[in-house]
């Protein structure tokens, strides 16, 4: 049984994808009040934003114990981020590795901006906990997904706002198979199926074909990782190496 911090409310960064949907469920099991926050930054796969409402509605209707805890949703226009980012996440270009070793899907400063804005909203809403789906196990090397980055950001935000906000990253040390397993632990097969069908991960925004592991093109790094993680989860295995 996961403990509940009744006195604390949480704001979850919720994109509409697998990881953030799992984080919403994690927070709903843990906190009495959970609000969600999404960002429209001109992402190529903005279909994920269209999935958010369906996921929230499904969580309310299929999990009665969580229905009363799921609070307001916030959507922020961050089109300026897309305007200054020449990446495969915001442009229709081929996904490849750049000279610095990072994939060109990396959007510089994205998670730093996300968490800063989230902290400002949480401060205003009286919420003490921020929850993000950052992960340093199955990831593409994004520096703003690292544990050290999140810890440093927590310090900076608390100093800058003279508060005591806590940044929670429940997926930080989980691989994708373990993320699927966490969903099962939180909400059983019903939550796994909700995440499989209702969330979106594919970088190119393909949502025409439903695979065993969910919708997607099946070829981009995000789809390959989700597919491998789901297959390993079904077999009870771990996935520790992200695909190229």
UniProtKB/Swiss-Prot annotation:
Pathway participation: Purine metabolism; 7-cyano-7-deazaguanine biosynthesis
**What's an example GO BP annotation here?**
queuosine biosynthetic process
* Cofactor-binding details, from the entry: Binds 1 zinc ion per subunit.
List, alphabetically, the Pfam families matched: QueC (PF06508)
Positions that bind Zn(2+) = 202, 217, 220, 223
User: Which GO molecular function entries does the Swiss-Prot or TrEMBL record give?
Assistant: ATP binding; ligase activity, forming carbon-nitrogen bonds; zinc ion binding
InterPro entries assigned to the protein according to its UniProt record, in alphabetical order: QueC, Rossmann-like_a/b/a_fold
Q: Which cofactor does it need?
A: Zn(2+)
So where does ATP get bound?
A: 14-24
E.C. numbers: 6.3.4.20
Give the CDD domains listed for this entry: QueC-like (cd01995)
Q: Which residues cross the membrane?
A: none
- The reply on keyword DNA-binding is no
Q: Which reaction does it catalyse?
A: 7-carboxy-7-deazaguanine + NH4(+) + ATP = 7-cyano-7-deazaguanine + ADP + phosphate + H2O + H(+)
Q: What is this protein for, i.e. what is its function? A: Catalyzes the ATP-dependent conversion of 7-carboxy-7-deazaguanine (CDG) to 7-cyano-7-deazaguanine (preQ(0)).
The entry assigns this protein to a family as follows:
Belongs to the QueC family.
The identity of this protein, by name, is 7-cyano-7-deazaguanine synthase
Q: Organism source for this protein? A: Burkholderia ambifaria (strain MC40-6)
Write the gene name.
queC
């Amino acid at each position: 049984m996961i403990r509940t911090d009744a006195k604390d409310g949480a704001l979850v960064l919720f994109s509409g994808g697998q990881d953030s949907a799992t984080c919403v469920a994690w927070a709903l099991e843990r906190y009495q009040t959970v609000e969600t926050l999404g960002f429209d930054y001109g992402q190529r796969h903005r279909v994920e934003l269209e999935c958010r409402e369906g996921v929230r509605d499904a969580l309310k209707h299929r999990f009665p114990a969580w229905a009363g805890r799921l609070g307001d949703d916030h959507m922020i226009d961050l089109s300026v981020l897309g305007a200054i980012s020449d990446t495969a996440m915001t442009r229709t270009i081929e996904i490849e590795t750049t000279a610095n070793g990072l994939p060109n899907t990396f959007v510089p400063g994205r998670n730093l901006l996300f968490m800063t804005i989230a902290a400002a909203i949480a401060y205003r809403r009286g919420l003490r906990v921020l929850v993000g789906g950052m992960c340093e196990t199955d990831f593409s090397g994004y520096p703003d997904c690292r544990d050290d980055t999140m810890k440093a950001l927590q310090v900076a935000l608390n100093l800058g706002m003279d508060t005591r906000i806590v940044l929670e990253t429940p997926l930080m040390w989980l691989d994708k198979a373990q993320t699927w397993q966490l969903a099962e632990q939180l909400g059983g097969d019903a939550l796994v199926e909700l995440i499989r069908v209702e969330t979106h991960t594919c970088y190119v925004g393909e949502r025409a074909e439903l695979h065993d592991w969910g919708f997607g093109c099946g070829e981009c790094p995000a789809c390959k990782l989700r597919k491998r993680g789901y297959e390993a989860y079904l077999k009870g295995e771990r996935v520790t190496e992200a695909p190229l």
